[in-house]
Design a protein with these regions (language model features):
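Conserved small/polar residues in nucleotide/adenosyl-binding loops
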Residues: 175-177
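General detector of N-terminal leader/presequence modules that precede the first folded domain
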Residues: 1-173
Length: 177
């Protein structure tokens, strides 16, 4: 089960959401654990868990009936990581891992080794008309000064400032059970 709770602070220009992934995330992990390729390394599991939570938060914060896909492509050991969220809080997440991964690797190490990483957020309407293309915004995995971003939350905040011109604070936390 996934849970989503929204809140506001009266008299302040602040609103927020909390998402909690439990059984649904465990199902994603158990499917991968039982696959021929075996479990993801811990940094990949962590990244995908954060991506799943972030995609659900973003999908639920906009008035949109369709899928929101958060995709990271890069030149590190993870070539591609994708999380897709639906309005009913269902989601899926996967990654294409091409090389060994250090247990302490950060986002920059995983997907942005040589500074070529990109983040794409795609909105795919459920009632898309023939010929209509999904909306997609793409930003580099680097700050304005070229510094490689180390955390997914930094990357999404950067995306929201660059692509949506929206000041955003995102806190992602994992609790391993």
């Amino acid at each position: 089960m996934s849970e989503l709770h929204s809140f506001i602070f009266e008299g302040l220009p602040v609103r927020g959401q909390i998402v909690r992934l439990t059984d649904s995330w465990q199902e994603v992990l158990s499917r991968r654990d039982g696959s021929q390729t075996g479990p993801w390394p811990l940094p990949v599991r962590n990244l995908l868990g954060e991506m799943a939570a972030a995609s659900l938060l973003m999908q639920s914060s906009i008035k949109f009936n369709g899928a929101l896909e958060l995709q990271i492509q890069g030149d590190g050991p993870i070539k591609l990581a994708v999380a897709e969220a639906q309005p009913d809080l269902s989601f899926r997440a996967t990654a294409k891992v091409m090389a060994g991964i250090d247990d302490h690797a950060h986002l920059a190490d995983l997907v942005n080794g040589n500074g070529q990483g990109r983040c794409a957020i795609t909105l795919d309407p459920q009632d898309r008309q023939p010929g209509q293309q999904p909306y997609q915004g793409i930003v580099p995995l680097a700050a304005a000064d070229g510094t490689r971003l180390q955390r997914l939350s930094d990357m999404i905040q950067h995306y929201m400032r660059q692509s949506e011109q929206l000041d955003t604070v995102l806190v992602l936390s994992l609790i391993h059970i």
